[in-house]
Regions:
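Conserved "landmark" site that anchors the functional core of diverse proteins
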Residues: 1-317
Length: 317
């Protein structure tokens, strides 16, 4: 059991996502930083899409009520257990009565807390992911207690398993994100396209799990921003009438009525997600679909083959 003592501004349960319901207007949700989420599960030997606690934008505190092994991945947090510093991206052991603190620091927005054995939560529409606007999934509030799962790996020592720094995403305040040509690129003037591909945009503080609003040089349309609403994809970049791009993220709506100038490669979405509002800047680099697919596969391989496993898996807690 783990109890929430202090919630962050954005705290939720996120698994691999709620798939199969977008045609009904239900977003997939899932983690803002898919790499950190997947790596957290891999480090504690859970399944890739198992549920983690996503902590976002501010600090959080937890009371550990059951002996367990945990890992915290992501960026922008300093982790302590009973006041003792713990290394992110490295598995450590907690005992009943411990207090785990995730202190918000510069350098990122989102952290993922994964427990060996997973979290025992009911699914809603095939997923445990929280989607606040529709009331789907568990609302994580102060005093909420989460029961841990009982998968076999939870009994084996995983302490020390880690993903080396060189295998982690290169988070930072200056991001160059790969992107492909969008559905409506012909709806923009040459000057507008040039602005998009050559401007370093800042992150508007009015950003959230649905989308990051960017600020910078205005992107000029040929015939207006509005279109008949069409499906939107994770990473698609819409440009409304004000000419400021909006990057669709985990809780993005299933349809949108603004022109889509580009789609960000899934490989680089974690870099954007961890880019701090009001501080970070994002510039887009045009790539082909094939290049984007290759880059994503390479990121997955970093998790699958990059974990240091210099521990005795058969040492019991």
């Amino acid at each position: 059991m783990i109890e929430i003592l202090e919630t962050s501004l954005f705290m939720s349960i996120q698994d691999g996502g709620r798939w199969g319901y977008q045609r009904y207007g239900v977003p997939t949700s899932g983690p803002m930083d898919w790499f950190a989420h997947r790596a957290a599960n891999a480090l504690v030997k859970n399944f890739p899409g198992d549920a983690c606690i996503e902590v976002g934008m501010t600090s959080a505190n937890f009371s550990i009520q059951t002996d367990c092994q945990v890992v915290v991945t992501g960026a922008g947090y300093f982790v302590t257990l009973n006041g003792s510093a713990q290394t992110m991206w490295t598995v450590f052991r907690c005992q009943a009565g411990d207090v785990l603190h995730l202190d918000k620091q510069p350098g990122g927005n989102w952290a993922y807390l994964a427990m060996a054995g997973g979290v025992d939560l009911p699914q809603m529409m095939g997923s445990t992911s929280t989607y606040f606007p529709a009331g789907l999934g568990s609302a994580l509030q102060t005093g909420k207690k989460l029961r841990l799962g009982h998968k076999v790996n939870a009994a084996h020592s995983l302490v020390g398993r880690n993903l080396p720094r060189e295998k982690q995403p290169q988070y930072g305040s200056e991001v160059e994100a790969m992107a492909m040509t969008g559905l409506h690129s012909k709806r923009f003037t040459p000057e507008g396209l040039n602005s998009f591909w050559n401007t370093a945009y800042s992150i508007n503080p009015r950003s959230d799990r649905m989308a990051y609003r960017l600020q910078g040089e205005v992107i000029i349309h040929k015939e207006g921003a509005d279109i008949i609403s069409q499906g939107t994809a994770l990473g698609s970049v819409q440009v409304p009438a004000d000419g400021q791009p909006i990057v669709m993220l985990a809780d993005h709506p299933t349809t949108g009525g603004y022109t889509q100038i580009a789609v960000v490669s899934r490989a680089d979405l974690p870099l954007i997600a961890q880019c701090e509002p009001g501080i970070g800047r994002v510039k887009f680099k045009h790539v082909t679909l094939e290049k984007a697919q290759h880059a994503y596969r390479e990121e997955v391989r970093k998790i699958e083959s990059g974990i240091n496993d210099d521990v005795d898996d058969w040492t019991l807690l």
